Amino acid sequence: MDFPGHFEQIFQQLNYQRLHGQLCDCVIVVGNRHFKAHRSVLAACSTHFRALFSVAEGDQTMNMIQLDSEVVTAEAFAALIDMMYTSTLMLGESNVMDVLLAASHLHLNSVVKACKHYLTTRTLPMSPSSERAQEQSARMQRSFMLQQLGLSIVSSALSSSQSAEEPTAPMSSSMRSSLDQRTPFPMRRLHKRKQSVEERARQRLRSSMEESAISDVTPESGPAGVHSREEFFSPDSLKIVDNPKPDGMADNQEDGAMMFDRPFGAQEDAQVPSQSDGSAGNMASRATQVETSFEQEAVAEKGSFQCENPEVGLGEKEHMRVVVKSEPLSSPEPQDEVSDVTSQAEGSESVEVEGVVVSAEKIDLSPESSDRSFSDPQSSTDRVGDIHILEVTNNLEHKTSFSISNFLNKSRGSNFSASQSTDDNLPNTTSDCRLEGEAPYLLSPEAGPAGGPSSAPGSHVENPFSEPADSHFVRPMQEVMGLPCVQTSGYQGEQFGMDFSRSGLGLHSSFSRAMMGSPRGGASNFPYYRRIAPKMPVVTSVRSSQISENSASSQLMMNGATSFENGHTSQPGPPQLTRASADVLSKCKKALSEHNVLVVEGARKYACKICCKTFLTLTDCKKHIRVHTGEKPYACLKCGKRFSQSSHLYKHSKTTCLRWQSSNLPSTLL
């Protein structure tokens, strides 16, 4: 046997006791105001109060709780405590921000969602025709809360009191306007998040109930409309529908009332807005938009790896002709994120060199080169307008490549020789190579002797240098830009010098990709350090005669002028750096022993040899050089992870490593 009006009667009695100070066991102090209340009611409504009372259970000092008046104002708490006892919140433009802040502090999730929804929509509620119509609206809203608990509504007491005290005519306009006004709210909410399948099923049922609710509320049958909706709130339907009201509140005038029809136990999952009648069509259009955006992103991602002018014959395995064309800055093609080096292979195709498959999709671009490839304003004038034609064959004797050993000599003043090695076989197509003997760009097979057997793909050519193979890394590649390259090993051709110009086409990314391709293909076993391109707009040219450590008066001129073969005007270089005097050098002996550190004149006397960036202290310069070399001297003693900066190691040891260590502790210690 059920007593449907029992819960409403209990809360009415509790509210009466609170207002008259009867049987209250706690006092909430907000500023200079005191609010008497019951612990059980506060704990049932707010997890904040539940935590306070449960921790200090039995402590008599917790009878008086003081709240921060800067966070919770007295007016806002008065409205919230009225809502706890009556499920009615007086919300308007004047107090919505105070109520939102106080509800967030007290963990009243349903009130927070209601306030956010009110601030988002900024829709002023319609004014009720009379106070009695407003009171009748409040009673009907509270009846929904009781129906969700699986109880039938008491019709005798409510209908008799309403019919004896109030006419039902004023209710029609106010109630119909308040119900009709809720329809635009869910339309805006729909575009904020994608809802799950369960929510869609619930909202479809809510929309049907809303239609019946609007049709049932008429002037002739105001209280009877409540009974006609009883069938939607049977205990069976409650398993599917947990929020039959579309908004969980009734919007009134600026000082109107918001009625919370949710049971107090389910406040954590309460969602204020729901779906309107057009839910199916809106969800379908939303899903279509999401799918279209995903397809567009996928197409754009694939398109960014397409080559600009590919002329690669797939069937020509023994002899492939790759044409790399320099495009102006205002090129209409969308592939602006990848430099021209990556255009040697299409997005789905790959170029096989000595058994190492280097796919364009797997090439890792350094961030500096990819950002400067098309964003540099000088890139349109720095590019060489001619077409660089490469003759790429599987015959290793006919292929001139820039081996890593060219850039990793131990003596800085020596000449660097071009050699053949399987460690690095990607020729540099982005630099302007000027051959002294009027040779074509980047030696073709006719440039060298045709003698010698051709090695099969995947074979390893013996290193002509006397250095061990493990010295083929760690040295920065940019330090030898502009040094004369002498062709010595295996070739009897003429000598040629190369002046590298920073043409804005990702010069350094070509070397880093060449180093990356070999370890991924398994052709070489040296470690891989990712190189970061220097930030200087022009790659510097350093002559061996200028690096003499003995002559203190000799000046190291960082010549940044760009040379072109076809008579283009040279670009002005960066400010020239002058080598420090003998007095300064004598005071900076420690810096002279450091690799890649240069002592120059001026206040910032420590310069990076790779990119010519100057620093005030030697420590800062050494930290910067690690960006180029990829060194990580600082290791974590707990997990073994290495870092290039000591600050990174400190942050790791205080945060990430502690979490990793705590996750491995036995559960008994936690």
Curated annotation (Swiss-Prot):
The question of whether Protein biosynthesis is a record keyword is answered with: no
* Zn finger (C2H2-type) location: 606-628, 634-657
Q: Which GO terms describe its molecular function?
A: DNA-binding transcription repressor activity, RNA polymerase II-specific; RNA polymerase II transcription regulatory region sequence-specific DNA binding; zinc ion binding
Q: Which UniProt keywords apply?
A: DNA-binding, Isopeptide bond, Metal-binding, Nucleus, Phosphoprotein, Repeat, Transcription, Transcription regulation, Ubl conjugation, Zinc, Zinc-finger
Q: Which GO terms describe its cellular component?
A: nucleus
Q: Which Pfam families match?
A: BTB
Q: Which domain of life is it from?
A: Eukaryota
Name of the featured protein: Zinc finger and BTB domain-containing protein 5
Species whose genome carries this gene: Mus musculus
**Taxonomically, what lineage is the organism?**
Eukaryota, Metazoa, Chordata, Craniata, Vertebrata
User: What's the name of its gene?
Assistant: Zbtb5
